[in-house]
Amino acid sequence: MSNVNEYNDIVAFHPGYYIADIIEDMEVSQAEFATRMGTTAKTLSQLINGQANISNDLAKKLSAMLGTSVEVWQNLQNAYDQKLIEIQQAKDIDAQAELVKEIDYKYFVDVVGLPKTRSINDKVANLCKFFKVADLRIMLQPDFLVNLRSSLSLNSDKNIINSRAWIQTAINISKDIETQPYNAEKLKGYLPELRGMTVKKPKEFLPRMHEIFAECGIAFVLLPHLKNSGVNGAVKWVTDDRVVLAINNRGVYADKFWFSLFHEIRHVLQQKIKKVFISSTLEEMMDINNKLEIDADKFAKNYLISPEDYRRLAPSRYTSDDEIVEFAKTIGIHPGIVAGRLQHEGIIPQERCSKLKEKYVFEIKKMNRQILGKDEI
């Protein structure tokens, strides 16, 4: 170990660096200097080479021997320690720099009001503070956010950091949403009303939806898409009686929105408190081979369109727009949900009946941690 540490333009001089100069000026050997100082040759050698720090006892001996104050040596040690911290911080920031480049910082400026900056150092500092982590690389660790359960094929740091950033953002925003203690029976009782909202416009159903979820112990967060996150929705229990349910609002068609919502509702009802569920695309949610995900998938499909009703429709590749609209009307659901189901199951081509699939536009205002709840859309 050296008694001088350098990184970029930061230089840290260990007190041993100055002691070596003093020994040279005194024209004595290290052994003699150690004897005069009242310490061992080994201790002095470690001190000179930066392998040991100045203790209060050594500072006292040096001050008496050289006619300085004790504080001189203590200050040299403190200055060195501070420089080491600066060096480590600089190294940490440089190590996080590549990770920051994978994150759309502007998203956090627009969505949660982080300060605008072009400085990588500032971006790292601002994101660490927002995510409440000492280092962004912590968010790559397998246990970050506790027992992550994902239907997503996350195989790159870019995907992992952004998916977890999106979830943590939803959790942070949810802190401003007041909820009652979680009540599963109350939530089940509201399911018919939630299903009935499928025929309404977002500006009509969202305020009531927020109220229902809050009453059931669910902080519902509708959050803009974060590039490279691949997240469509997520469920995270923050306490035993409070859960965050977050949905991505990117290019959401009615069928995908409602399938995603009821998929996540099922995860809430599963009440696996120690797990975090992440759902990606509609296709992945419906195809994943996992018991809990299969259960959520089955629940969403069957609650929106019951098996009995689906058999009654007896869909075929010749099913027309008018038939879908009429069927949807009889079961009280948005026709786009029926069309989306038929497309996904390959009964009708993707281009067929697409005009029935209404695209929702959620205008989410600039927020400071508060996502649209009671505000108008």
Could you say what each language-model-derived stretch is?
Residues 2-377:
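Active-site hotspot residues in diverse enzymes, especially metal/ion-binding acidic/histidine motifs
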